[in-house]
């Protein structure tokens, strides 16, 4: 890193800044949801669409981001991503209704979807390949700090200012980032093949309509027959994409990916697994504030052990997988995450609050080992010619499954909490207890898929740093 020219180091700082903005916004909102609900006159049990709208938009837009960067230029697209993200933040802060806030989050999601993948592409173009890993480690470090800082910062802003400030703080930072991008970042472009617009539209419509059908009756009052029609339309769009991909050589995602058994199994397991684990970052701060009466700041602080556990486990997960194998690790962590979720609910409802940080630390560790194992299992056997496409599809599936998970969590809360419930009341405790029990079952189910993972054929390489001799 020290051998790089000054202008290249500045460009890496810009990319790192984008990673930080996107990762911070992913976690800072969850802590503020109950306060948003009170301000907007909504039930806190129906605020999940604020999260779903952002994550689903990221999932829909991810496949287009890389092509746009190659065609229009990394500087232009990264600049546009920061501008859209900043404008979305402004509109979020100005929102007076839940529907306005959801639409503003969609605009934010368009910017967020382009920021991270285009940032990775930028690093690949501006640094020598030998220094790529060191550069990516540098730019992704702020992205790891964002989830650690987000919940606590969100709690402070909500408790001592208002929820609007979790979006307003993005505006001056976004303006500086956009100006730096425009002035310092080169606009690399390359020849691109024709974009698969029909395939993109089919996937986008299928994902959006199926998610809407899953939650439409609770959040929008859509009739059952209309929901059935939406579900059928979404499924038809996905099936039409499969037919299109089979016939087209330039499809967005080639069906040749699924000839690799571990990719097919890993992708299915990742989709099912992240539906369950995607509920936890949304449900935990809502449960702490609405179910137990914690302040926003206290609830935000309680999320920090979970992030610390996740970051700490990443250092040893490769050794664990090499020792026990993918199948055992994935089955054990999947069932373990379900049990830890039940333990968290039990400890909280029993009033043993001093144990909550320890339980959340354990939850973060188990979840991190599971995530890392799912990701590497999915991609490890793909040929080089399909690795980029497979990684893009996995990224899209990760975001889609998280949005479905939050949608299901909101649906469960709405189903068990039909009438208005008070903070830290007996009725509220029952609503969250039934919801967490259902979540534990959903989290545990992917163990059936992971039990079919074949035996490992080779071990993963452990990257270690040699100590310099004195």
From Swiss-Prot:
InterPro entries: MFS (IPR011701), MFS_dom (IPR020846), MFS_trans_sf (IPR036259), Multi-R_MdtD (IPR023721). It is found in: Cell inner membrane. Gene3D superfamilies: MFS general substrate transporter like domains (1.20.1250.20), Multidrug resistance protein D (1.20.1720.10). One of its GO terms (cellular component) is plasma membrane. Pfam families: MFS_1. The chain crosses the membrane at residues 12-32, 49-69, 77-97, 102-124, 138-158, 165-185, 197-217, 225-245, 263-283, 286-306, 342-362, 396-416, 431-451. This is Putative multidrug resistance protein MdtD.
